[in-house]
């Protein structure tokens, strides 16, 4: 537990996969938590113990109430870059520590070196933070395990084959819970201050093997059918921006037949890194067909 006079931690991106988990971790650690939401109705999804503030990264002055007397900020940049400099300047003037959720764009593995507009934006935010001077920790998760929910759960729940490109592309999915655990510690543990951590899962797995792992968690066969990049583009129309689809296809193509970049950062910081198989077992209910 932490002293009652501990400065509050402001968490952005609280309706997202990582931010929501961080709120829980910080509250469990006894820290006062402020949650930034764009819409007041989003407060209904958050724990009552979290103090909710309405603000928008595109309107830097709207952050001032949430930043007053705060000690640290978890920053997920979800806005266009136009307001980034003004937001970072406000953070640097008001809080001691910033933990940024970025990406592994500095990692030389070809998977992370494909054209990626989001990685370019992350690099821009990193430069702004470095110039502004707050104590900063940068977290660089690779592929999140929870992507499987959006990508494959609809087909599996419907009892269908997973139709996906580049089945032999290898990634090392990192459990969202591990990312949140590292981020929460970085927000209050001085030993993690100033770090730069590439966070991956502990094992390189092909995409087809990841689908099989979900099937094993369900105790059901889940067929995997390879489709072409062109077909993937067609079926993705309307559900994902073209730039994102191109980025994914380029990254997967670069990862075919090549072991994924695997780090020990999660285990070094937490003692253990959750495997994708463990993630699949813990989330099997989200994939289970209604009739099974």
At which residue positions do the language-model features occur?
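Oxidoreductase cofactor-interface core, primarily capturing Rossmann-like NAD(P)-dependent enzymes
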Residues: 2-45, 58-61, 65-70, 79-86, ...
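Cofactor-binding loops of NAD(P)H-dependent oxidoreductases
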Residues: 55
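Hydrophobic "lid"/C-terminal helical patch
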Residues: 183, 187, 214, 248-252, ...
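A general structural signal marking secondary-structure boundaries and capping sites
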Residues: 190, 255, 287-290
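Terminal hydrophobic/aromatic helix or amphipathic segment near a protein terminus
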Residues: 213-257, 292
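Amphipathic terminal alpha-helices
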Residues: 269-292
């Amino acid at each position: 537990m932490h002293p009652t006079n501990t400065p509050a931690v402001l968490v952005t991106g609280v309706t997202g996969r990582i931010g929501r988990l961080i709120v829980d971790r910080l509250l469990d650690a006894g820290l006062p938590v402020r949650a930034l939401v764009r819409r007041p109705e989003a407060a209904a999804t958050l724990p009552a113990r979290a103090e909710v503030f309405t603000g928008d990264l595109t309107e830097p002055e709207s952050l001032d109430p949430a930043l007053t007397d705060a000690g640290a900020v978890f920053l997920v940049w979800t806005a266009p870059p136009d307001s980034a400099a003004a937001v970072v300047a406000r953070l640097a003037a008001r809080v001691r520590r910033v933990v940024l959720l970025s990406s592994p764009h500095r990692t030389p593995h070809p998977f992370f070196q494909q054209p990626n507009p989001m990685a370019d934006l992350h690099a821009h935010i990193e430069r702004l933070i470095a110039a502004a001077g707050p104590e900063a920790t940068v977290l660089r998760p690779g592929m999140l395990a929870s992507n499987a929910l959006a990508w494959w759960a609809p087909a599996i729940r419907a009892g269908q084959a997973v139709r996906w490109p580049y089945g032999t592309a290898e990634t090392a999915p990192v459990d969202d819970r591990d990312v949140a655990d590292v981020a929460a510690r970085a927000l209050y543990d001085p030993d993690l201050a100033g770090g730069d951590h590439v966070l991956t899962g502990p094992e390189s797995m092909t995409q087809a093997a990841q689908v099989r792992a979900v099937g094993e968690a369900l105790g059901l066969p889940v067929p995997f059918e390879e489709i072409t990049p062109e077909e993937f583009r067609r079926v993705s129309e309307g559900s994902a921006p073209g730039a994102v689809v191109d980025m994914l296809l380029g990254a997967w193509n670069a990862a075919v037949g090549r072991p994924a970049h695997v780090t020990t950062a999660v285990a070094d910081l937490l003692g253990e890194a959750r495997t994708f198989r463990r993630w699949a077992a813990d989330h099997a209910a989200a994939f289970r067909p209604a009739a099974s």
